[in-house]
Amino acid sequence: MKYSASTSTPKSAQPKEEELENSLPTNADYSKIDVSKLSEMMQRYVEVKQQYSHALLLFRVGDFFECFFQDAVTIAQELELVQTTKHAGKEIGRVPMTGVPHHAVEKYATFLVEKGYAVVVCDQVEDSAIAKKENRQVKREITRILTPGTLTDDGMLKARYNNYLAAVVIAKNYWGLAYTDISTGEFLTTQTEGLDQLTQELMRLQPSEVLFPTKAPDIGFMLRPGERSDHLPEYLPHSFCYSLRPQQPFSLGEAKERLLMKFQLASLEGLGCERLPLGVRAAGGLLEYLEETQKENQVPLQRLRSYTLADFLILDHQSRRNLEITQTVRDGSYQGSLLSVVDKTSTAMGGRALRRWLQQPLLSLKGIRARHDTIDELIQNNDLRQDIQRVLRQIYDLERLTGRTGAGTANARDLVFLADSLTKLPELSTFVSQGNSPYLKVLQKIPPILQELGKKIHSNLVESPSQKLKEGGLIRPGINERLDEMRKLAEEDQKWIASLETTERERTGIPNLKVGYNKAFGYYISISKSKANLAPDDYTRKQTLTNEERYITEELKEREVRILTAQDDLNELEYDIFVDLRNEVGEYAEEIRNVSRAVAALDILCGLADVAIYQNYVRPTMVDSRELKIIEGRHPVVEKYLPAGFFVPNTAILGSKNLEKNNSGITPYSAPDLIILTGPNASGKSCYLRQVGLIQLMAQIGSFVPASSAVLGVSDRIFTRVGAVDDLATGQSTFMVEMNETANILNHATEKSLVLLDEIGRGTATFDGISIAWSVAEYLATEILSRTIFATHYHELNELSSILDNVANYQVTVKELPDKIVFLHQVQPGGADKSYGIEAGRLAGLPDSVIARARQVMQQIENHSKIAIGLRKGINKKEEEEIITVEQLDIFSEEFGDSLL
């Protein structure tokens, strides 16, 4: 593996030289040390470290994994461990050292990887006793390279999250992307135009690591989140880890050859990506990285599949965030998200798949209806659904167990869990045998070999095997004749040892004589100091302790050699039998994963059926039109957290006739394309917007929806502009962020899109804001023709409905009482003329004097200002121009100021 041996770091992570000199202990930088003067062990450490200068090196020394020099300083700081020093050679002296117990290395390595570091594990690959006997250093080799995107162990992964490794290739405005989760084997690639779409696709995937080819001198370095390099394009999201890679593996020729060899193909046509050169390059470069990092553990990836962004409903990052699909806007938590409400899956793989469904809703009516059909059948057959879920709860993570098995890293317990799951599949198949819907039919025929594999694993492995593969205790009796014979001989020797204590007590007359064993000294005979004078002449003293003497006899020594040798041979044979079994199971990784995907999908649909029953959801009618008709819709998350019956349902009807243009403008509509939604602050406008967006999204993942009824045309995109935040990282104000997001919507929305806008134009001066809001709404209604709900406090926009036939006014109603207002949360036809902002401030707890003064100022403003916007009814751009007149009394004039005093 070729990595830059340079110790330079990316500029954003590079401390000043004087800071390094003041903060690091003496000899913290190995590059400034004469390596020949280091001890032999330290020379080996530096040799490995120079190969992997970009990574943190954990180096096995006895019962610990230790790191030295700058790595020791880094790890001590990141893990909050005690840093000490270690002697590195007579002329070198002591160098920084930090260590972790060998049995806890996985835990500490996981912490480091989560912080964005690559970790190289260099382990002892032979018995240290052998090296000691031969008076040499124990052999150490790299056994694992851990990076954020290449983890497979359960302890390092979140069960219900995919762990994606992505690779990106960019050519001008075109880009190719490949990604995989090596723990599950999925492997996909795509290629398209538009760098903004690349950013959005990366934000959808949330990869743990992104590979980027470059000619940079810092090849091999991993940029942690927030770190940048001159060789990394600025438009790539800053929130990911980037590994800077050499360009050669990403060349088309080498990438193509690597893919063909990996999947044993003659051409790329079999993968469907022969016309995606950038996607092929990204996929080939990703494969090369896996070959380098996984060493001998070749990852059993599924065949590369290509996809296009147009296959799915597109949600940009801001829309996913605003709709709170997988996490809340406020604190990024899972609770309070849509996922927290609809995830009733029983398996980890079902949980991961549901997350993917929510990120990529379907566009295919056939695909959507197939999911609805399955949920319908599961709701109608309650016993069937409960039987399926009972079996699902007994199925482990087939995808990841299969991944570790195919990669050769699964332990015996993994195989037992895999067998437990495989032997449950026939029962699942029996339950769905009478099913009529697509997702039930697919599991009616499960390959018989999978059950046979499960039975074979159970018949070969003991019920509760050790997780340590080279210490025996794995294979059942009767599996291997030679193993049984060796065990019989070993048992006879153990019986002899067990009887030795009784025999020697009788022979010596020492009643408290004991026979013991430890790893350092082997077997021994123990006699207390007070009885040591009774030890027979054939006893040879082996060790003296405070209260006892330990002896050995020639016969015991011979038995010890035989027992230990036999045990080593036994353990080795058991390990070999286990590896053969694991390899055999690994050959069927593709078949197991195909079934696991079907199981995960059925798991999701059973859970969605449960949600539909308990939350009173209905099946939406999906149509091939622009219609959106939600009767008494409810916000799926808000209603869940309110007492039963407290949520006020609301109807939304948009675009129920296909649009037809003629020379005079737009034909009349039975339902508008654009709704101007007005109403008080805190009355529920934003909730209504999100509610409509979530119902559309839920329908397109195949879920039932919270409403009395729903008729929905398929949306190609859902855009949301809800809430206001600045972006300090890029120096953008709240208003500039709002304008950028609005521009993105206007440039990408189509007549099949659903657009949900809240408070466009509020971040600037009032009349600038009104002008922008009016123009945006008008453009959406006349040029894009998307289905839009436009929430605003600019009541002037209500005039649009009198000008454009496909615009309607709706308001969130309130009830005015003498001393307060009551929010009714009902959306009804008509435009509001008040925002009740002062009342909202009173409810929030503003001081009474502030409220009183605000009312006084508002009265004066209403008496002295006037805004009038008029448009000629009907729009014909070629013949007429819009006329907008704004008359405004300067509220900062001396006359107006005096009136407030």
From Swiss-Prot:
Q: Cross-referenced PROSITE patterns, in alphabetical order?
A: DNA_MISMATCH_REPAIR_2
What are the binding positions for ATP in this chain?
G679, P680, N681, A682, S683, G684, K685, S686
Bias class Polar residues marks the residues at 1-12
One Pfam family in the UniProt entry: MutS_II
Q: Which InterPro entries match?
A: DNA_mismatch_repair_MutS, DNA_mismatch_repair_MutS-lik_N, DNA_mismatch_repair_MutS/MSH, DNA_mismatch_repair_MutS_C, DNA_mismatch_repair_MutS_clamp, DNA_mismatch_repair_MutS_core, DNA_mismatch_repair_MutS_N, DNA_mismatch_repair_MutS_sf
Molecular function GO labels: ATP binding; ATP-dependent DNA damage sensor activity; damaged DNA binding; mismatched DNA binding
Record keywords, A-Z? ATP-binding, DNA damage, DNA repair, DNA-binding, Nucleotide-binding
For the region Disordered, give the residue spans: 1-25
Q: Which Gene Ontology cellular component terms are annotated?
A: cytosol
What Gene3D superfamilies does this protein's entry cite? 1.10.1420.10, DNA repair protein MutS, domain I, MutS, connector domain, P-loop containing nucleotide triphosphate hydrolases
Q: Write out the GO biological process terms.
A: mismatch repair
Among SMART domains, the record links this protein to: MUTSac (SM00534), MUTSd (SM00533)
Q: Would you identify the family this protein belongs to, as annotated?
A: Belongs to the DNA mismatch repair MutS family.
Q: Which PANTHER family match?
A: DNA MISMATCH REPAIR PROTEIN MSH1, MITOCHONDRIAL, DNA MISMATCH REPAIR PROTEIN MUTS FAMILY MEMBER
Q: What does this protein do?
A: This protein is involved in the repair of mismatches in DNA. It is possible that it carries out the mismatch recognition step. This protein has a weak ATPase activity.
Q: Please identify the protein, giving its name as recorded.
A: DNA mismatch repair protein MutS
The organism's lineage is: Bacteria, Bacillati, Cyanobacteriota, Cyanophyceae, Oscillatoriophycideae
As recorded in Swiss-Prot or TrEMBL, the protein's gene is named: mutS
